[in-house]
Design a protein with these regions (language model features):
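Kelch-like beta-propeller repeat domains
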Residues: 1-279
C-alpha cells in the first residue's frame, strides 16, 4: 500500500524478503530523494491492502494475511494515520466482504472502496465518511455488474478512473466513476492485466506493470510497460518501459510528479527501485 501526504510518500505493509509479510512503514522524501528507516505501525502484517490520503491524513486497512480458506485471513480493520504527529487511530471496521485487492479514491471528504475479493469477486462499492466514521454501500444499479479484484485506478483533475483486474481471467476494462457512483465506460487498457498500479500527474494517468494470467500458475506474462492515459481525449499511449517487469508495484503523486516502483518480479523477488514520472 502507498499514499502521499505533503512532500512525502509512504509505503505500508506488503511482502518483503523471503516472502515475509510485513507490517512496517517506510517514508520517502521526494525533495531530497531519501528513504527514512522503517518504522513500526499498529497494523497486522498484510498484503493487498488499501490506502488513501485525505488532506493531511491517511486512511489504511483491509487486505489479506493467512490461509486462503480462513475467515480471519480477510482483514477488515480501518485506521487513520496523521503524519504530522505520527499517530494512529482505529476506526469503524469495513463492513463489506471485498477486503482483498480493493481500490480506493476520494472526493476530499469521503473515501470510496471499489471491487476486491472476499470469498468471491466483488462488484461492490462502499463509501466511508471521514467526518462521521460511517460506512455506506453505494447503490449497485449505478454501475455495471463488473466484478474484479487487483484492479488499478487514479484521480486526475477531479475525475476518477478505474479498471483492469482479475475475475477468472485478466481484464482490461476502463471506467470513469463520478462521486455519485455512476460509471461511464472508457477506452480499454492495452493489454489485459491484474496487479498493475496507477499514479496521476496534472494531465495524465500512468499505469504500470501487472500480469496477464495465462490459465495456469506458471503461464502468463509480466508487463514492464508504462501506459499513459489522457482523460481529455480518452486515449492510451505507450510512455515507456521499466528495466524490469513486475506486479504489485506501488504508486503515489507528490507535487504533480508520479512515482511508481517496488513490486515483485516473475521469480517473486521483491524489487526496491522507485521511478519518477513527469509529463
Amino acid at each position: 500500500m502507498a499514499f502521499a501526504v505533503g512532500n512525502k510518500g509512504y509505503v505500508v505493509c506488503g511482502r518483503g524478503e523471503d516472502n515475509a509479510v510485513c507490517s512496517d512503514m517506510y517514508v520517502y522524501d521526494a525533495q531530497s530523494d531519501i528513504w527514512a528507516d522503517a518504522v513500526e505501525t499498529p497494523l497486522q502484517a498484510r498484503v493487498n491492502g488499501t490506502a488513501c490520503a485525505v488532506g493531511d491524513k491517511a486512511y489504511i486497512g483491509l487486505g489479506f494475511c493467512g490461509h486462503a480458506y480462513g475467515d480471519d485471513a480477510y482483514l477488515n480493520d480501518w485506521w487513520e494515520y496523521t503524519p504530522a504527529t505520527d499517530t494512529w487511530r482505529r476506526l469503524a471496521d469495513f463492513p463489506g466482504e471485498n477486503t482483498v485487492g480493493a481500490v480506493a479514491y476520494t472526493d476530499g471528504t469521503h473515501i470510496y472502496c471499489v471491487h476486491g475479493f472476499g470469498w468471491g469477486f466483488s462488484a461492490d462499492m462502499l463509501c466511508y465518511d471521514t467526518a462521521s466514521d460511517i460506512w455506506t454501500t453505494i447503490d449497485r444499479s449505478r454501475h455495471p455488474e463488473y466484478a474484479s479484484m487487483a484492479g488499478a485506478g487514479a484521480t486526475c483533475n477531479g475525475r476518477h478512473y478505474f479498471g483492469t483486474g482479475y475475475n477468472t481471467h485478466s481484464l482490461n476494462e476502463w471506467y470513469e466513476i463520478d462521486f455519485r457512483g455512476n460509471w461511464t465506460k472508457r477506452k480499454n487498457v492495452p493489454g489485459k492485466r491484474e496487479n498493475a498500479v496507477c499514479a496521476a500527474t496534472g494531465q495524465y494517468i500512468y499505469l504500470a506493470g501487472g500480469q496477464h494470467f495465462g490459465g495456469t500458475l506458471t503461464d502468463g506474462k509480466f508487463f514492464d510497460d508504462i501506459l499513459r492515459y489522457a482523460p481529455e481525449t480518452d486515449s492510451w499511449a505507450l510512455a515507456g518501459h521499466t528495466p524490469e517487469a513486475a506486479i504489485n508495484r506501488i504508486g503515489f503523486t507528490v507535487n504533480g510528479s508520479a512515482f511508481i516502483g517496488l513490486g515483485e518480479d516473475p521469480q517473486e523477488q521483491p524489487l526496491k527501485t522507485l521511478y519518477r514520472i513527469e509529463d
